[in-house]
Amino acid sequence: MSKTAIIGGGSSGLAAAIFIKTNDPGAAVTIFDRMDRVGKKLLATGNGRCNLSNTAACDFGSNNGKKYAEHYHGADRSFAVNALSKFGINELRDFLLSLGIPTTFENDKLFPLSLNASTVVDVLRLKCEQLGVIFKLSQQIDIIKSSSDKFIISGEAFDNVIVATGGKSQENLGSNGSGYKMLEAFGHKCTKLYPSITQIRTETEFVRQLKGLKIDADCKLYLDNKPIAEQFGQVLFADYGLSGPPIFFISRYASVYGDRCKISLDLMPNYSMNDVFDLVKNVANNPFCDDLTLENLLTPIINKRIGQVIIKHCGYKLSAKVENITDRDIKRICSGLKAFELKVTGVNGYNIAQVTAGGIMTDKFDCNTMMSKLKPGLYAIGEVLDVDGDCGGYNLQWAFSSAFSAAKNITTGKHR
């Protein structure tokens, strides 16, 4: 009878336990977790609705004949391809349905039908209990001892160990970066780490005046004045900068490159520059504007507070008379609406970030099995590795896919 220890009771750890026990009912599986209950971080996924995957999770590109996963990042973007190919969104849906969890789509995003993360956490935990998985909770594991063919954790010997500790993000929900040191002790190396899928901090002179406002915008991130990322969606203005789904999507790059970046918001994405000019020109030429100031020039076409900030951002005084502005002034104001630029100063940190970008380098792990090339029987899955996905369900898909690969190898023993 093989014995496997799984360090970390998150989505990847719970899934790995179920895969192992389903394929080999006689196997002994123990999950160690530093929290008093498993799945705490999973409960917060997708604002508590649990965005499980995305129809684009298995979209692959090719670079010099080498396949890579388009929505995943890391030093080797090809590493995730095999796991995602073997266990993609369809396999995930089938797996969840086998546990009694039906799923549904919202646009390209996959959710449990209940739209409640607790559904997934509770069912995964209950299935583990039903299969005889042992839970050892409130246990902080810092060291994995090993002999020639065994691993020793808390005085107990195991044949295999799966490190599923996650990254550094949201320590209050369980991830504290401990997995990096465990794997480094066996000779593995860790990349530089960054908070990702988080809010972007910007110069605050103008955004503070818009605190609490939301607007659909096309968001472009520039590195040294060259565009590197773009996403459309609802942006939330905050006193520190910007939040919202499109901001989360591009935050990885802002985290890595910091104040070398600027962000540009197209606040009227459904209109061309010429269309916006015509709209503003029409307001300026309207007789009712004869006695108005620039304070209200944009009020007919966009939120009043946003309009006033754009006027000031473009260098005009709100007290200036509308009747005195020229076509050149209007073009400048329209440029502000189509490209509201803010200097990036950083991102919100690990306590808020949903994901850690970077991790244990994948070059010393087998991409088919997730097993270490340095220590047979040692596995790493999920976010602890240098694989992180875009916002939108990609990271949970990777958690399940990598768990499947590791569990399959453990139960077949082909590479042990």
List each model region and its residues.
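A conserved FAD-binding loop/helix module that cradles the flavin
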Residues: S169-F186, V387-H415
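Glycine-rich FAD pyrophosphate-binding loop
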Residues: A5, K21-N47
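A conserved short coil-to-beta-strand element within the FAD-binding core of flavoproteins
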Residues: L137-K150
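Short hydrophobic core segments
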Residues: A5-I7, F32, I141, E156-S175, ...
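Beta1/beta-strand and adjacent pyrophosphate-binding region of the FAD-binding site
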Residues: M1-S12
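An anion/pyrophosphate-binding glycine-rich loop and adjacent beta-alpha core
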Residues: D36-V38, L43-A44, L52, A56-D59, ...
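A glycine-rich dinucleotide-binding beta-alpha-beta segment and adjacent secondary-structure elements
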Residues: L137, Q308-D388
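Glycine-rich active-site loop/strand segments that organize a redox cofactor
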Residues: N47-F105
